[in-house]
Design a protein with these regions (language model features):
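Feature captures eukaryotic membrane-trafficking machinery centered on endolysosomal pathways
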Residues: 324-358
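Bacterial N-terminal signal peptides
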Residues: 7-15
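Sec/Tat signal peptide C-region and signal peptidase I cleavage site
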Residues: 16-22
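Short, hydrophobic/aromatic-rich segments at coil-to-beta transitions
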Residues: 179-185, 211, 319-327, 350-354
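Solvent-exposed N-terminal domain segments of exported/luminal and surface proteins
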Residues: 23-211, 217
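Non-transmembrane domains of secretory- and envelope-associated proteins
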Residues: 22-111, 231-313, 320-322, 358-435
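Short, surface-exposed coil-to-beta transition loops
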Residues: 195-198, 209-210, 335-340, 352, ...
Length: 435
């Protein structure tokens, strides 16, 4: 009799376990009713949004086959596994010469082992080069300052990146006298009191050379150099920083990294992109534009009668992926954050969650990033393709967020692999953007 009772209890437990798993199966929705089933799959502060009914998202399947790279990328990654290593500064270098290559295509470190003491920084370099692979870009986008109930303020931004490495080589400048990785400029288009404000950055390959940063403020009518530590500060007073970028845009060598582990996780993705609804349009001067069909329903404040927090992702869905979890501590003690925790997809190497802590260990900010599948540009080139842009920096202490990614109204640039001239990024002429 006792044996029979134990068997019945075991069967009941298995049935309950099976039902719990079914609740998080593809096609179901994660919300208040079943959020506890995701407690080991999400950062606690994100899980809390689902438990409170502030976030609600469908769960979708994201097979590895949904993400493909350019022709030749896999072969280049395989060669990197043979030829690249890290030097003492943790930059990628050629094994034979101990010098950084002029050009790297593919994942610098395609073979990651958990027992490798350098695993974390190798994962990060793969993540960074995944961004570089996307190529030169220009995006006219909106930053939204959002309270739990509404949009408080907006700023239009015209953001341009030029990459000297990582992207297909014919898109990069033919010469690189400053030995740069990339150049970046952000021009504020609106509101009127900020119009003409510009921020410019140069990232050098030399691990000992800090980023060069300049800012132009029209009311001051001059260009001034800015400390690299300021890249962690809120951009235009928002909760988003320059070091956030696509996911993490800090210089890897400026941090000390360790691997926390590899785990299952839920991350945000684009269900319509997975369904093949991405639109690519070739541009007359070269490159491609990807208009956002879900631009007007990206986050809660845009949707009539939305019941969750105003910055909640609406067009996005959740998908279960394997992720690497990394921890970085800045070497510069003037850096705003004392620790950064990054969750990175272990196949696509796109970022999912970027958690930032104070020097005392308190969680301050969580950067929530969408990881869509790839979509083709042409028969041989492909990269991330989406129907909306959603990157949200949530200030968990102040209960507010900054949403980045939605495009400004009209047929505005959301462009990649476009031709760009290095002269566009000259700090001596930054004041040309002044109103």
């Amino acid at each position: 009799m006792r044996r029979l009772t134990l068997l019945v209890l075991l069967a009941a437990a298995l049935a309950l376990g099976g039902r719990a798993r079914a609740e998080l199966a593809v096609g179901t929705t994660l919300d208040r009713s079943n959020a506890d089933q995701a407690k080991d799959l999400l950062p606690p502060e994100i899980l809390s949004h689902y438990q409170k009914g502030e976030y609600t998202n469908k769960i979708v399947d994201f097979p590895n086959s949904a993400f493909q790279w350019d022709d030749g990328y896999a072969e280049a990654s395989a060669q990197n596994a043979k030829n690249l290593t890290l030097d003492a500064t943790k930059q990628p270098v050629d094994r034979a010469t101990n010098k950084r290559p002029d050009y790297i295509m593919g994942h610098p470190f395609p073979e990651i082992r958990e027992d490798d003491p350098d695993a974390a920084v190798k994962v990060l370099w793969n993540t960074i080069y995944t961004v570089y692979t996307g190529g030169n870009s220009r995006n006219v986008t909106v930053l939204d300052w959002v309270s739990p109930t509404r949009i408080e303020r907006e700023a239009g931004q015209d953001v341009t990146f030029l990459y000297y490495d990582g992207q297909p080589k014919h898109y990069s400048p033919t010469s690189n006298p400053e030995d740069l990785l990339f150049q970046f400029i952000a021009l504020t288009l609106s509101p009127a009191d900020l119009q003409g404000t510009a921020a410019l950055s140069w990232r050098y390959k030399d691990p000992a050379k800090r980023d060069a940063n300049w800012a132009y403020v029209p009311s001051l009518r001059r260009v001034r150099a800015v400390s690299p530590a300021n890249r962690s500060d809120g951009f235009l007073g928002s909760d988003l920083s320059q070091d956030d970028g696509n996911f993490f845009d800090g210089k890897p060598e400026d941090f000390t990294w360790r691997l926390i582990g590899r785990r299952d996780a839920l991350r945000m993705t684009d269900p319509d992109a997975l369904a093949g609804k991405v639109v690519r349009r070739p541009l007359p001067g070269g490159g491609w534009r990807t208009p956002f069909s879900n631009n007007d329903r990206t986050f809660g404040a845009q949707v009539k009668d939305w019941k969750g927090v105003a910055w909640a992702p609406v067009a996005g869905a959740l998908t279960k992926r394997k992720v690497w979890v990394l921890e970085g501590v800045p070497k510069d003690h003037y850096y705003l954050y004392g620790k950064i925790e990054l969750w990175v997809d272990d196949y696509t190497y796109t970022g999912a969650w970027n958690r930032k802590f104070s020097w005392q260990g308190d969680l301050l900010n969580t950067y929530q990033v969408t990881g869509p599948p790839s979509a083709p540009y042409n028969a041989t080139e492909r990269w991330l393709g989406s129907t909306f842009g959603y990157q949200t920096a949530e200030n968990v202490k102040a209960s507010r967020a900054t949403v980045a990614g939605p495009s400004m109204p009209g047929d505005v640039p959301d462009d990649r692999r476009i031709p760009l001239a290095p002269s566009f990024f000259d700090y001596q002429t930054l004041n040309r953007f002044g109103k």
